[in-house]
Amino acid sequence: MYNTLKTITLVHGVSGKEHRVANTLKEMIAPYCDASHIDAMGNLIAVKKGTSANPKKVLLCGHMDEIGFIVNFVEDNGFVRVAPIGGINWVACAFGEVVSDKGVHGVLVPNSGTKASDFAPDLFYIDIGADNKKNAERKVKIGDTFVLKSNLTKLNANRVVGRPLDDRAGCGIVLEIAKRIAKEPVADDVYYVFSVQEEVGCRGSKTAAFAIGADVSLTFDVTGTGDTAGSKPMAVKLGGGAAIKIKDMSVICDSEVVDKLTRIAKEKNIKSQHEILAYGGTDTSSIQMTGAGCRAGAISIPSRYIHSGVEMIDMNDYKACIDLAVEFIKE
């Protein structure tokens, strides 16, 4: 599991430029599905056909895109001004090493003298080591994208840290589910959706959900925890198991799906916890409301330091998410 997760975290894929991630995952999931394609939006959609004469459609979703920065101006002194892609935690990202989709390295820096309390997008630039505009433009152009440079690392036997676990962890879970049920008879059609542009408005999942017309869905994404110093009160903690989402700021999950996941976790002795997130949202909401709608649920991966280069998860929680989803599909 870890090696697969590490492989997909190494691929550059900000919102709108997920094609490398999609191609990597398409190759990885090929042995475990009946068909796959990349749609017009850029979503990767794979399917395992069910054995039932009248199968229902089950949609499993993780988003491929990550937060990052897009070049919008090159200054005369060679500094590269950028705009954010997605919700950037500027304090966490300041003075971090970044790398572009073309392999150009640099450092994300705030204007000299800027206080952390005043951090804002227009106060940041990337220093790529160029001493003037001409030299900088040999390496970058308007529209190039940068991401935080941080490889996945094991802290101990269970906990890993790096980027972009939001949401390559969700993609990894969907892939591991496909592996687990590949040779098992499953009554329903299972659609594996690796969506695009979640970080900028849950866009890709809307078109994928419309095309599929699912009866039920499970979304896999990271969620915050309440177990760090000074964190807001929250029941979710790292190492507490798969987080069964009840609601967040964008969705109220289907009560039957929540109850079923809760029951299965108890019956199968899968470590779990319940999630009520007071901020943010995921593809769950867009899938739930697309077309005629569907019974939407989510299994979240507890994570610390989201939208930074040091996102942290527990691999036992990761495995619990996979185990719970597999048992849900079998029923």
Residue map of PLM features:
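N-terminal hydrophobic/helix-forming segments and targeting peptides
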Residues: M1-E331
